[in-house]
Amino acid sequence: MKLLLLLLCLGLTLVCGHAEEASSTRGNLDVAKLNGDWFSIVVASNKREKIEENGSMRVFMQHIDVLENSLGFKFRIKENGECRELYLVAYKTPEDGEYFVEYDGGNTFTILKTDYDRYVMFHLINFKNGETFQLMVLYGRTKDLSSDIKEKFAKLCEAHGITRDNIIDLTKTDRCLQARG
């Protein structure tokens, strides 16, 4: 009887753990909860020059608008030392949890993980002139996040083949925060 009870507890633990993990991924994603202000925390890519200073994918997120079958992104980029605001709309694709946006080529992205209140992690694949690269971003509701969340993001990057030397912590850079207003 004790063995049966132990197996039942183990089974429930595994089911609950799986449900918790699944609640923050594609199938069970509540996109409406992503609406609001966000800050760029960490960015990673297998094509580092895209995320370095003056790289086209070094963007500083400000706000995500949840629209009908699309997401609006208000962000800033730095050009010649000046912060410039952009707004792009990403449209839902037929794939579950996937979106498409035109920016420095075509981009498909998914939301890998979120807890809605503190962080969201995106995975993007860019297609331009027959070439592709990956980009991963960690956004936070606050200007910085705990080292635990950053480490979870780094491990997710590694799982996607992006090495730690291609991960940049943007909290240590000028993120155009003064322009947020």
UniProtKB/Swiss-Prot annotation:
Keyword Disulfide bond assigned: yes
Pfam families listed in its UniProt record: Lipocalin
Positions annotated as glycosylated: 54
Gene Ontology biological process: aerobic respiration; cellular response to lipid; energy reserve metabolic process; glucose homeostasis; heat generation; locomotor rhythm; mitochondrion organization; negative regulation of DNA-templated transcription
InterPro entries, alphabetized: Calycin, Lipocalin, Lipocalin_CS, Lipocln_cytosolic_FA-bd_dom, Maj_urinary
Keyword presence, Lipoprotein: no
Induction notes from the record: Synthesis of this protein in the hepatic parenchymal cells is induced in vivo by androgens, glucocorticoids, growth hormone, and insulin, and inhibited by estrogens.
SUPFAM superfamilies cross-referenced by the UniProt entry: Lipocalins
Subcellular locations according to the entry: Secreted
Molecular function in Gene Ontology: insulin receptor activity; odorant binding; pheromone binding; small molecule binding
UniProt tissue specificity: Abundant in the urine of adult male rats but absent from that of females.
Disulfide bond sites: 83-176
Positions of transmembrane segments: none
One GO CC annotation: cytosol
The entry's keywords: Allergen, Behavior, Cytoplasm, Disulfide bond, Glycoprotein, Pheromone-binding, Secreted, Signal, Transport
Residues of the signal peptide: 1-19
Family: Belongs to the calycin superfamily. Lipocalin family.
Function description: Major urinary proteins (Mups) bind and release pheromones. They may also protect pheromones from oxidation. In this context, they play a role in the regulation of social behaviors, such as aggression, mating, pup-suckling, territory establishment and dominance. Acts as a kairomone, detected by the prey vomeronasal organ and inducing fear reactions in mice.
Protein name: Major urinary protein
